[in-house]
A protein has these predicted regions:
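Conserved MFS/SLC helix-loop-helix module at the cytosolic interface between two early adjacent transmembrane helices
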Residues: 62-101
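Cytoplasmic helix-loop-helix junction between adjacent transmembrane helices
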Residues: 106-145
Length: 216
């Protein structure tokens, strides 16, 4: 499907870049804080601290199975905003986590929410463009995705110096909130959803994705 884009192309490009940045930013900003966070949560083994990263990757991996079919059924913007809401709630939960288990749960949920902008950004681009222009937009999006980790750790260190490790989660929550407001007010709905039109294809894909998760 190729829909008309009703926003300036440079703004659309910037918005897609920010959507792609959410997952990479929230993953790499935490790296400088693993030591102090582990100490406060009573985790002395450096290998155990790495589970904070693993939990996030697990959440984002599972989330990517679901947001594509769900956005086909219920619309791109709705699922994007739901995913960002989950991400923000999980980020705030992480700021008050008083046990390592709670932190792992919050990070997994944060990853699940971060999967929404990652998946839906690509779907929106496919809705709006075809051919060479789609390839150029996706190339820019992937460039942002690759470039963000280069400075995310340094940004995490700056936030850590200005505050404590929960401030990193507050930063990512604020970043996602800005994205949610920007998307909610400016991003046009590029695919309204098939749930009310008897289209069972996305539903079958969702069931298939659920089966993969359950089997693994």
């Amino acid at each position: 499907m190729n829909v008309q884009l009703r926003m300036p192309f440079p703004e659309f490009l910037a918005l897609i870049g920010v959507m792609m940045a959410v997952g990479a930013l929230s993953l790499d900003m935490m790296l400088p804080a693993l030591g102090v966070m582990g100490d406060e949560l009573g985790i002395t083994d450096p290998n155990d601290r790495q589970q904070v990263i693993t939990a996030f990757l697990l959440g984002i991996g599972i989330g990517q199975l679901f947001y594509g079919p769900l956005s086909d059924l219920y619309g791109r913007k709705r699922m994007l905003l739901i995913g960002l809401g989950i991400f923000i709630a999980a980020s705030l939960w992480a700021t008050v986590a008083h046990s390592f288990e709670a932190m792992l749960a919050a990070r997994a949920l944060q990853g699940f929410g971060a999967a929404a902008p990652r998946v839906i950004s690509a779907a929106v681009v496919r809705d709006c463009f075809v051919g060479d222009r789609m390839a150029r937009v996706m190339s820019f999006a992937m460039l942002v995705f690759i470039a963000v980790p280069i400075f995310a750790s340094a940004l995490g260190m700056l936030v850590l110096l200005a505050g404590d490790w929960p401030a990193i989660f507050l930063f990512t929550a604020a970043f996602a909130l800005v994205l949610a407001l920007w998307s909610g007010f400016r991003l046009p709905e590029t695919h309204a959803g098939d749930a009310g039109h008897g289209n069972r294809g996305p539903f079958r894909r969702l069931l298939h994705a659920s089966g993969i998760v359950l089997r693994t």
